Regions:
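Active-site/substrate-binding loop(s) of hydrolase catalytic cores
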Residues: 1-152
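C-terminal accessory segments enriched in acidic
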Residues: 101-108, 112-120, 124, 129-270
Length: 270
């Protein structure tokens, strides 16, 4: 969510309208994943002094939605997944108004996109270095052209990102369901966060902010990762910069492809 905070505090749309949801599911910030040992907060040093942020989880807190079923059935498709996925917002889209807490959040976001006729939607994520789809954009088929143009422009700036099509048969994900259920061009972006990985060493604030981990350096040498991972690690500032640069590239690509619907956002950090 740090890229979203950067947008809220800096971005100035001069043409078009920009909606930013910094915490898609506020419940996820009220707890951390059990048995993972992740810190509740992390601190970022800024020119104005230290700023403290919650770390949280990707899942709705059990205090808001419990118990998990043995099997989670996606409401609109009937797809069956592990019961714990019932609290994963990115398996709940397009949601339903009378569903679980997580489904209601998904429904609210879907309804906002419909009501405001939002033309393009970007869901910002992080993933572990060993996850196959990382440092990448996942695009609904209607958004593939915009994503392709954006990635080519990023390459000119020496920023390499992959491009993945949204799976048609994996349901509940934002890039699939929002693209199917609304008129928006649905995209999802992934950067890499070693604090989320299975191969990590000590889990603390330094790992979240500095992104350095000897275990991942070793895993890189063994060819077990899908992104480069050296002694410099994958710091938070680099991950946020990648998201912001990719968003700017998407804005520019959309504007060039849709001259009647300009999306020009100034004051974007670079």
């Amino acid at each position: 969510f740090m890229a979203a905070i950067v947008l809220i505090e800096n971005a100035m749309p001069t043409s078009g309208k920009l909606y930013v949801i910094p915490f898609a599911n506020a419940s996820t910030l009220t707890h951390t994943d059990y048995m993972e040992g992740t810190p509740r907060h992390f601190t970022v040093e800024t020119a104005g002094g230290p700023r403290r942020f919650r770390y949280g989880s990707r899942a709705t807190s059990p205090a808001d939605q419990w118990p998990d079923p043995d099997i989670y059935v996606h409401a609109s498709s009937g797809q069956k997944l592990s019961g714990s996925e019932t609290r994963n917002l990115n398996r709940a889209y397009p949601g339903r108004p009378d569903g679980t807490f997580t489904e209601k959040v998904a429904y609210a976001i879907t309804s906002l996109i419909r009501a405001e006729k939002i033309d393009i939607t970007v869901d910002l994520h992080e993933a572990s270095p060993e996850y196959p789809v990382v440092n990448a954009i996942v695009a609904h088929e209607r958004a593939m052209k915009i994503a392709s143009i954006a990635l080519l422009n990023l390459e000119f700036d020496d920023i390499t990102m992959g491009l993945e099509p949204s799976p048609v048969k994996l349901r509940g994900l934002s890039h699939r369901e929002l693209g199917d259920a609304t008129g928006t061009l649905a995209l999802l972006m992934e950067t890499t966060n070693p604090a989320q990985g299975r191969l990590r060493g000590v889990t603390n604030e330094a790992l979240i902010v500095e992104g350095k981990d000897a275990m991942y350096v070793a895993a890189q040498k063994l060819g077990r990762l899908f992104v480069p991972f050296g002694e410099e690690g994958q710091p938070l500032k680099t991950r946020v910069a990648r998201h912001v640069a990719a968003l700017q590239a998407v804005f520019d690509a959309y504007t060039s492809d849709s001259p009647d619907k300009q999306l020009v956002v100034g004051a974007m950090p670079s």
